[in-house]
């Protein structure tokens, strides 16, 4: 809730920076988080968390994971030498059984970051995300991914414009919408979606977090 994450060096971790919301906890609904002026690099340490644990699903070589949070702004960060992915925007546990848990990230804005050297040794040993990424990317690993998982109503009728992922980055960055829901339902007809224009839009800067 209402956090500024800035001026950090994240290195030699499994995942450099994690912005998570988890089910079955007394405090949920993470929102209004700014991640800026950080350096996240060489986060290629093997994941030693117990399998079955949410954190245990994070692949080695990840710069930043945004999971099941809303209103997150990521800007002016440097991502480099992460062997799987620089930024992953993904849904949380879809089968948690927690009626109060909303697993889908929404209103995420990513802009004015720098990226270099990614995806050169993706971790396919932990969790499903990296395995799915490698299969769908087919050798062309991206800097930023969105898993493309939406509530069924939005998958059919469209996502509200104020909840869409906004990606305002250099034209040289590589992006991939995994479109994972349709991949699992209609894999024969699935093709990688790398079109960044679907995610262009105006940045609405989040307010600075005030000290208590």
Task: Map each language-model feature to its residues.
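Short, recurring structural edge motifs at helix starts
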Residues: 21-26, 61-64, 98-99
């Amino acid at each position: 809730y209402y956090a500024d994450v800035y001026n950090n060096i994240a290195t030699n971790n499994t995942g450099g920076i994690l912005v998570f919301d988890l089910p079955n906890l007394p405090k949920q609904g993470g929102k209004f988080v700014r991640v800026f002026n950080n350096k996240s690099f060489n986060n290629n340490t093997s994941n030693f968390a117990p399998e079955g644990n949410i954190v245990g699903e994070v692949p080695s070589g990840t710069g930043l994971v945004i999971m099941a949070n809303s209103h997150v702004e990521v800007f002016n960060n440097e991502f480099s030498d992460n062997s799987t992915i620089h930024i992953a925007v993904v849904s949380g546990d879809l089968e948690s059984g927690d009626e109060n848990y909303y697993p889908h990230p929404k209103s995420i804005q990513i802009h004015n970051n720098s990226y270099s050297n990614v995806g050169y040794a993706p971790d396919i040993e932990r969790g499903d995300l990296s395995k799915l990424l490698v299969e769908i990317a087919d050798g062309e690993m991206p800097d930023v991914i969105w898993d493309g998982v939406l509530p069924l109503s939005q998958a059919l009728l469209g996502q509200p414009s104020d909840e869409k992922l906004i990606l305002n980055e250099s034209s040289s960055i590589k992006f991939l919408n995994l479109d994972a829901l349709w991949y699992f339902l209609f894999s024969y007809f699935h093709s990688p979606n790398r079109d960044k224009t679907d995610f262009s839009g105006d940045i609405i800067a989040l307010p600075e977090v005030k000290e208590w």
